[in-house]
A protein has these predicted regions:
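Short alpha-helical transmembrane segments in multi-pass integral membrane proteins
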Residues: 1-17, 72-139, 181-235, 292-357, ...
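N-terminal transmembrane alpha-helices
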Residues: 2-38, 52-67, 71, 96-103, ...
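Transmembrane helical elements of multi-pass membrane transporters/channels
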Residues: 12-31, 133, 144, 167, ...
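Transmembrane alpha-helix boundary and packing residues in multipass membrane permease domains
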Residues: 17, 21, 33, 70, ...
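Helix-terminus/linker motif at the lipid-water interface of multi-pass membrane proteins
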Residues: 26-45, 114-121, 177-184, 245-276, ...
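Small-residue-rich hydrophobic transmembrane alpha-helices
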Residues: 44-104, 141-160, 266-329, 361-375, ...
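Hydrophobic transmembrane alpha-helices of multi-pass small-molecule transporters
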Residues: 56-59, 103, 171-176, 201-205, ...
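Short runs within selected transmembrane alpha-helices of multi-pass transporters and secretion channels
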Residues: 65, 133-152, 160-171, 189-202, ...
Length: 456
């Protein structure tokens, strides 16, 4: 655990990020509440089917942005300020380039992709309506989510939080106008999100136009090594954002097989609520990333470990509290979304089962963030992409044997398995990279050589 002298710095990074992550999630839930009560189960199911494609937009920005932000922070910590600014400018250039193919994909292939993701009949129509407007703002969304880590890593965590909060408030206001007042349904929810992103983009652009933050043309100079390094580190954050949608798709398909459209609508409610716990934990993990990366770049390796251990305690506590709250409110929560009586019964049974997994989710996801914050792309990617593979295996296997009950239980089994893998990787990481478990100088020298290489 960190000492008292570090608590202020720790909270300076973690609290605004956690608030921003959580409020963004709550605004998404408001989308679901409006659509669920106005359109009904098919509207909820449609957004649930479409969301993996929207998550691709978020993942593209998050992966590139976080990869570049980690490099920038490590360079800043090692004293290479010019290199840090180059990493920032190069990341913005990459965000611009990668936003183009993602936008074209959503514009021209939304319907066939939604069909592959489990959409059919009216559910498919609702999914396409949602994406039809949302895709128009996709380039802005890539830029926004990619630049937020850069802003946080430059120490302006409150500014990043304000940008997220303003976007969310505008989203809620236009949700009411478009979905409720104008009765535009799921298309209105998409339009509200798109307009909110336009406003958020103005705040992001204003930040980088400030005198102290303005970048020169030399900072946007393409660099193949920096390009490759950013993508390598960004693989895990990309996966953290996108691959949970593999969970959604896998559970949607299996829920449809073993419980019909009612089970799919029930899982839409569950995924909204579970998302709150995920974002609280991810806020702790990613909120502390700038601090971890800077300390790692400066060679303060024992402090890095203390921050990580503090994250474990906080994240696991959040998981335990989430389990208690979801269990206590398992019958009330479905009514917020206008769920049918049949869907409510499924949610009431499944919610505590799935919430149990979040005790282990804290360990696995803090570990993932810790690995990429310390320039260990291999460890972070193994956990992220291993989770996706395990979800498919456990869901299909347990669903085949135990039906719908097995589908819900697969999430817990996945996180328990990953927690064991994370513990093994953490032990190896401490031995090989940080050198914290050995007094031999060779271990420490190797760690410092790695830091120096990352700073170049």
């Amino acid at each position: 655990m960190i000492e008292r002298s570090m608590v202020k710095s720790y909270l300076h990074y973690v609290v605004p990020a956690t608030i921003a992550f959580t409020l963004t999630c709550i605004y998404s839930i408001v989308d679901g509440i409006f659509v669920g009560n106005i359109v009904g189960d098919t509207g909820l199911a449609g957004i649930n089917v479409a969301y993996p494609l929207y998550a691709l937009v978020l993942a593209t920005g998050t992966g590139i942005g976080m990869g570049g932000a980690v490099i920038s922070s490590i360079r800043e910590g090692s004293g290479n300020r010019e290199g840090a600014r180059h990493a920032t400018g190069h990341t913005i250039l990459m965000l611009l380039l990668f936003s183009i193919p993602v936008t074209l994909l959503l514009l021209f292939f939304a319907r066939p992709l939604c069909a592959v993701l489990g959409g059919a009949g009216e559910t498919l129509n609702q999914a396409v309506l949602y994406l039809s407007v949302l895709s128009l703002a996709a380039p802005l969304q890539v830029m926004i989510v990619g630049c937020l880590p850069l802003i946080r890593n430059r120490g302006h965590v409150k500014y990043a939080m304000v940008a997220s909060v303003v976007s969310g408030v505008i989203n809620v206001i236009f949700d009411y106008v478009f979905v409720v007042a104008l009765n535009w349904g799921t298309m209105g929810a998409g339009a509200a999100t798109a307009l909110a992103q336009c406003c958020s983009f103005l705040l992001i652009a204003a930040f980088f136009l400030r005198k102290n933050e303005r970048l020169g043309l030399r900072h946007f100079k393409p660099n193949t090594e920096l390009f490759a390094h950013s993508l390598k580190l960004g693989l895990a954050p990309f996966g953290l954002t996108l691959l949970p949608e593999i969970t959604v798709v896998t559970l949607n398909v299996n829920a449809l097989i073993y419980g019909g459209e009612t089970a799919v609508a029930a899982y839409a409610v569950i995924s909204y609520v579970a998302y709150v716990i995920q974002m609280l934990i991810q806020g702790v993990a990613d909120g502390s990333q700038p601090l971890v990366s800077q300390c790692y770049g400066a060679g303060k390796l024992k402090l890095v470990q203390k921050i990580r251990n503090t994250n474990f305690v906080v994240a696991i506590s959040i998981g335990l509290i989430g389990l208690g709250v979801m269990t206590a409110l398992r019958y009330q929560i479905p009514s917020w979304f206008g769920a049918s009586e049949a869907a409510t019964e499924i949610v009431a049974f499944a919610l505590p089962v799935i919430a149990f997994a979040y005790m282990f989710f804290g360990l696995t996801h803090v570990s993932t963030s810790y690995f990429y914050a310390t320039d260990d792309a291999r460890g972070s990617s193994l956990l992220v992409y291993g989770e996706a593979a395990l979800v498919v295996l456990y869901t299909c296997g347990l669903g085949f044997v135990y039906g719908l009950t097995g589908v819900w239980g697969a999430i817990g089994m996945t996180q328990i398995t990953l927690a064991f893998v994370a513990a093994v990787l953490l032990r190896r990481h401490s031995h090989k990279r940080l050198g914290l478990t050995s007094v031999h100088k060779g271990h420490k020298a190797a760690a410092h050589r790695h830091i120096a290489a990352a700073g170049r």
